[in-house]
From Swiss-Prot:
Belongs to the aspartate/glutamate racemases family. GO terms for biological process: cell wall organization; peptidoglycan biosynthetic process; regulation of cell shape. Keywords: Cell shape, Cell wall biogenesis/degradation, Isomerase, Peptidoglycan synthesis. It comes from Streptococcus pneumoniae serotype 4 (strain ATCC BAA-334 / TIGR4). Gene3D superfamilies: 3.40.50.1860. Its EC number is 5.1.1.3. The gene is murI. Signal peptide: none annotated. This is Glutamate racemase. Pfam families: Asp_Glu_race. One of its GO terms (molecular function) is glutamate racemase activity. The active site is at 73 (proton donor/acceptor), 183 (proton donor/acceptor).
Length: 264
């Protein structure tokens, strides 16, 4: 048993999609979340800068005495997860392998699509992980650089957003049977993405899949929070506007949250 919180980091609000799933599956666990919205999105940035920023977020979470860190950002996972996991003495999870595994299980026709930031797509990490498990599957990857900024701005269902999603995803329509949402921001656009891709395409939320791995590791290391540990005190931090973060966060999590601005 370990009553310390689980730490989550992301380039912005996208990691809240993972938090929402954790609150649903593991409602007794406490959360500390840091979103670097001031420097979002990470996708277009060079790898060394992503590495530097991610380590800053990790070190911030370590000051909060977390028992586990979840890199709830596909771009950061692709660039620096292995390094962070190797250097810390607490469990560190990324969101890519769980998403790849889930896509393989869901694909009926062996044609998997991956959408993500330019860095995630450029890294080719999803194709590698999928082919490590099943080399016969076809993988089509597409960078969607405009999606995360739309989510960060709170434009989740505007006509402009719908047009951008349609025009961006058009090359994949009719070509895949499963689509990995390879950025934790993208589930906030899920209804629009599903509408564009069609009802038969399975959408894979890499962040939500990650929560199953969190549960496994909590049990394996015997660090579940005690059921009698007292009330939960979730803490949310952002490097940008706490008001904007709270507005998106409360809409997505369907509960009131307290958000604090921090400088890194």
């Amino acid at each position: 048993m370990d009553n310390r919180p689980i730490g989550f980091l992301d380039s912005g609000v996208g990691g809240l999609t993972v938090v929402r799933e954790l609150m649903r599956q593991l409602p007794h666990e406490e959360i500390v979340y840091i979103g670097d919205s001031a420097r979002a999105p990470y996708g277009p940035r060079p790898a060394e800068q992503i590495r530097e920023y991610t380590w800053q977020l990790v070190n911030f979470l370590l000051t909060k005495d977390v028992k586990m860190i979840v890199i709830a950002c596909n771009t950061a996972t692709a660039v620096v997860w292995e390094e962070i996991k190797a250097q810390l003495d607490i469990p560190v999870l990324g969101v890519i392998l769980p998403g790849a595994s889930a896509a393989i299980k869901s694909s009926q026709g062996g044609k998997i699509g991956v959408i993500g930031t330019p860095m995630t797509v450029q890294s080719d990490i999803y194709r590698q992980k999928i082919h490590d498990l099943d080399p016969d599957l076809q993988v089509e990857s597409l960078a969607c650089p405009k999606f995360a900024p739309l989510v960060e701005s709170g434009a989740l269902s505007t006509s402009v957003t719908k047009k951008v999603v349609y025009e961006t995803l058009r090359p994949l329509v009719g070509k895949v049977d499963s689509l990995i949402l390879g950025c934790t921001h993208y589930p906030l656009l899920r209804p629009i993405i599903q509408n564009v891709m069609g009802p038969k395409v399975q959408l894979i939320d890499s962040g939500a899949e990650c929560v199953r791995d969190i549960s496994v590791l909590l049990n394996y290391f015997e660090i579940n929070r005690g059921r009698d540990a007292g009330p939960l005190h979730h803490r949310f931090y952002t490097t940008a506007s706490s008001q904007s973060f709270a507005q998106i966060g409360e809409e997505w999590l369907e509960k009131e949250i307290h958000v604090e601005h921090v400088e890194l």
